[in-house]
Amino acid sequence: MKPLSSCALFGAVRALGGIKDALILQHSVVGCQWGSLAFRYAGKPYDVRQVSDVIYDEDVVNGGEKVLRKALQEAERIFTHCGAVFVVSGCVPNMIGDDVDGILATTEGSQKLLHVKAPGYAGNIDSGVETAYLALLPLLRAAEKKEAATINIFGIMNDDPYADNDLEELKKFLGSKVKINCALQDCSLRDIAAMPQAELNICFGYGEPLAKQMQEKFGVPYIKCAYPYGVAGMQKFLRQLGEALKIDFSDELADLEAAAEKLVYRSADYLVNLYQLPVALATDKAHLAGLQSFFAEELGMRVVIAEDTAEFSLDKMAEAAAKHKPVLLCGSSFLKNLADTYQVPLVRCAYPAFDQLCFTDNTLIGARGAALLIEQIVNGALQQQYKTDGRYAGLRESICEVNHE
């Protein structure tokens, strides 16, 4: 498994982690549980609904169906608050031919049992996300009528470092004009069942296969959007949403303009020295397009590397960094060693972030998000070892001049 691209099982676990009253049961070896849990646990140790039946050597020989059935019985006994169990099967049971569907069909209990077939060899983390999303279809219930100005959100995962705060910030922007019916990064089984009631589905990178199925079966249209980083990113999103739902967001757009003017007034003396400096981005596809637009269009930096982590490896990232010499890295904690090697700042904004946590209501979207990202970039530059002729020399000089004045 390549650390950046990971595997289908990791993607399935990520996609299902936001369903508060559902349990993820991995039918696989212990390493799958340890790896996927380690990335999630760092950010949310208080919300872990993930277990494993742990297939051993003897189960490879004799079959793992017995341990799966026992695990399902234990899940029913221990996780009484969970109305559903998603059995995510990994490489080993699929290679030895375990009849997972047969076990689920013959296991009695009150919990809904759904199989997500996600062996690592079958695809990368992106394919696992889409497979897990499609597994939600049996839970959906047809709606007699649509609820006007309501949306579902696909693509943002519960373990994204700012997922909760970004969702709350988005709700503030939408106000009373648009209701979020179901956001898969923070929802219940009831919310999922009611998804066909929504007027529109929003896909941030992921979720298009599920959205297409919902459009065909339930008549819910969808739009693909870039994640609304920064002022311009949020403005673009609101215009896109307003056009689809026939809603006027002119007041919200004006508020964003005012916030942008205030932010520029406070940060322009520093940001002018970042113009056209090379930056490298490596995130999942839910965030990549929005980040690329933010750095290029709002900050004026030169994006020399913009890679979807599902198609990339750390070795290739190192080769690209050696070639393009970025002065800033933006992505996950996996980029830390590379940032240390080149002595450049790392802005952690994507999964997995296991060496920097967020306990505040900070967000990465809209004007508040732009301010936080700018703050992290400038502070990261200032914290680098002083070099009189370094790429950040102009930034240091301008800050000294501002402080002197």
Region locations from a protein language model:
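An N-terminal assembly and electron-transfer interface module characteristic of large anaerobic redox
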Residues: 1-405
